[in-house]
Amino acid sequence: MATRVLSMSARLGPVPQPPAPQDEPVFAQLKPVLGAANPARDAALFPGEELKHAHHRPQAQPAPAQAPQPAQPPATGPRLPPEDLVQTRCEMEKYLTPQLPPVPIIPEHKKYRRDSASVVDQFFTDTEGLPYSINMNVFLPDITHLRTGLYKSQRPCVTHIKTEPVAIFSHQSETTAPPPAPTQALPEFTSIFSSHQTAAPEVNNIFIKQELPTPDLHLSVPTQQGHLYQLLNTPDLDMPSSTNQTAAMDTLNVSMSAAMAGLNTHTSAVPQTAVKQFQGMPPCTYTMPSQFLPQQATYFPPSPPSSEPGSPDRQAEMLQNLTPPPSYAATIASKLAIHNPNLPTTLPVNSQNIQPVRYNRRSNPDLEKRRIHYCDYPGCTKVYTKSSHLKAHLRTHTGEKPYKCTWEGCDWRFARSDELTRHYRKHTGAKPFQCGVCNRSFSRSDHLALHMKRHQN
């Protein structure tokens, strides 16, 4: 090693300063190695050399152990003083102090990949681009290994996803019956994203329910209305109307409010069980008017047959006539209030203190004063207020029928003109007599009077 160092020093040139007797071999070995113009650059390029010299420097042999080569000329010149030698040695100690090796720089192609970016780093390497003929499905990762929060399908989703908490869904499944299975199945996805869409139905405690846009919600309202109609008309309502009518109406109001609440929540319940449950509720303290209390069913006289034609323009009117007519007294009261604003808005109904005196046509004293036309036919006691009425009555005894129907092909004759007019309406279909309550029309006035008795009761 000493021979190699001396040969390197011989090529660099003679040393200008003669070294000290003891330290001269050490400086002669180190100066050719670290004596470059830029020591920092040499240390960066050769990080191991500085450590190697620092490691071998304490073990260097003294100069007398190695004989000088005869080919090297003896050094001539003045020797350094002790002060300069100490200063030079201190300066050299700065270059000979052991330093930590710099952090090795790992090339880009040897960089360790992270787990979350392993599928991305392989597309940003410095290698040459791949030809377009290679199928890119080889480089696509498996979709099932991706997290659901980082993946979003680019295709437009066909189904509507409605998120509901799992606790609420389990509570509804306990209280209500499960709905029937839909007749139309969900669409099947054959793309590569089908495995993600058929993943676990519960993500972060959120229940994902997939359903198609069907008109089931719109069809549920009429069924609830049917339940409400059944609820009000069910025979299970055993409520006495004479003993506790107020409590019965309270129970009915509670059942109506519960049925209306069922329309909003779309919950189906059996009407009979609902009525049984509502009967156990305590009654309220308010009272109802007498006209709204349930009354005993009264006998309705049969309405005369309607001779309306089955034309399409009267179908809507016939459907309206199917509903029960309102109260006759309320209709008359509203008409009187319109014509006479000074009259009170309400009339006494079913009043027991004041009963109007009703007169028959034969016992009315006012009519008795005006009846001056008597029938002189033997055995007939008819009396009329007008002479025309008496003449028409006398034709019934004589059998005279001067009024003949003028309709083509009709040979009917009548003794009275009003009978001919009534008969002629059968040919024309005219119905001049109309009910003011339900707008039902009749061809005869007596049929209208018989129909009005249904509104009175």
Curated annotation (Swiss-Prot):
<dbReference type="GO" id="GO:0061586">
    <property type="term" value="P:positive regulation of transcription by transcription factor localization"/>
</dbReference>
<dbReference type="GO" id="GO:0032534">
    <property type="term" value="P:regulation of microvillus assembly"/>
</dbReference>
<dbReference type="GO" id="GO:0060576">
    <property type="term" value="P:intestinal epithelial cell development"/>
</dbReference>
<feature type="cross-link" description="Glycyl lysine isopeptide (Lys-Gly) (interchain with G-Cter in SUMO2)">
    <location>
        <position position="52"/>
    </location>
</feature>
<keyword id="KW-0479">Metal-binding</keyword>
<dbReference type="GO" id="GO:0000978">
    <property type="term" value="F:RNA polymerase II cis-regulatory region sequence-specific DNA binding"/>
</dbReference>
<feature type="zinc finger region" description="C2H2-type 3">
    <location>
        <begin position="433"/>
        <end position="455"/>
    </location>
</feature>
<feature type="zinc finger region" description="C2H2-type 2">
    <location>
        <begin position="403"/>
        <end position="427"/>
    </location>
</feature>
<feature type="zinc finger region" description="C2H2-type 1">
    <location>
        <begin position="373"/>
        <end position="397"/>
    </location>
</feature>
<keyword id="KW-0863">Zinc-finger</keyword>
<dbReference type="GO" id="GO:0014901">
    <property type="term" value="P:satellite cell activation involved in skeletal muscle regeneration"/>
</dbReference>
<keyword id="KW-0804">Transcription</keyword>
<keyword id="KW-1017">Isopeptide bond</keyword>
<comment type="subunit">
    <text>Interacts with WWP1. Interacts with ANP32B; this interaction induces promoter region-specific histone incorporation and inhibition of histone acetylation by ANP32B.</text>
</comment>
<dbReference type="GO" id="GO:0045600">
    <property type="term" value="P:positive regulation of fat cell differentiation"/>
</dbReference>
<dbReference type="InterPro" id="IPR013087">
    <property type="entry name" value="Znf_C2H2_type"/>
</dbReference>
<feature type="cross-link" description="Glycyl lysine isopeptide (Lys-Gly) (interchain with G-Cter in SUMO2)">
    <location>
        <position position="94"/>
    </location>
</feature>
<feature type="short sequence motif" description="9aaTAD">
    <location>
        <begin position="118"/>
        <end position="126"/>
    </location>
</feature>
<dbReference type="GO" id="GO:0001228">
    <property type="term" value="F:DNA-binding transcription activator activity, RNA polymerase II-specific"/>
</dbReference>
<comment type="function">
    <text>Transcription factor that binds to GC box promoter elements. Activates the transcription of these genes.</text>
</comment>
<dbReference type="GO" id="GO:0000981">
    <property type="term" value="F:DNA-binding transcription factor activity, RNA polymerase II-specific"/>
</dbReference>
<dbReference type="InterPro" id="IPR036236">
    <property type="entry name" value="Znf_C2H2_sf"/>
</dbReference>
<dbReference type="GO" id="GO:0001525">
    <property type="term" value="P:angiogenesis"/>
</dbReference>
<feature type="region of interest" description="Disordered">
    <location>
        <begin position="1"/>
        <end position="83"/>
    </location>
</feature>
<dbReference type="GO" id="GO:0045944">
    <property type="term" value="P:positive regulation of transcription by RNA polymerase II"/>
</dbReference>
<dbReference type="GO" id="GO:0006357">
    <property type="term" value="P:regulation of transcription by RNA polymerase II"/>
</dbReference>
<keyword id="KW-0010">Activator</keyword>
<dbReference type="GO" id="GO:0030033">
    <property type="term" value="P:microvillus assembly"/>
</dbReference>
<comment type="similarity">
    <text>Belongs to the krueppel C2H2-type zinc-finger protein family.</text>
</comment>
<dbReference type="GO" id="GO:0005794">
    <property type="term" value="C:Golgi apparatus"/>
</dbReference>
<feature type="region of interest" description="Interaction with WWP1">
    <location>
        <begin position="324"/>
        <end position="328"/>
    </location>
</feature>
<keyword id="KW-0862">Zinc</keyword>
<dbReference type="GO" id="GO:0008270">
    <property type="term" value="F:zinc ion binding"/>
</dbReference>
<feature type="compositionally biased region" description="Pro residues">
    <location>
        <begin position="65"/>
        <end position="80"/>
    </location>
</feature>
<dbReference type="GO" id="GO:0014816">
    <property type="term" value="P:skeletal muscle satellite cell differentiation"/>
</dbReference>
<dbReference type="GO" id="GO:0043231">
    <property type="term" value="C:intracellular membrane-bounded organelle"/>
</dbReference>
<dbReference type="GO" id="GO:0005654">
    <property type="term" value="C:nucleoplasm"/>
</dbReference>
<dbReference type="GO" id="GO:1990830">
    <property type="term" value="P:cellular response to leukemia inhibitory factor"/>
</dbReference>
<dbReference type="GO" id="GO:0005667">
    <property type="term" value="C:transcription regulator complex"/>
</dbReference>
<dbReference type="Pfam" id="PF00096">
    <property type="entry name" value="zf-C2H2"/>
</dbReference>
<keyword id="KW-0539">Nucleus</keyword>
<feature type="region of interest" description="Disordered">
    <location>
        <begin position="295"/>
        <end position="321"/>
    </location>
</feature>
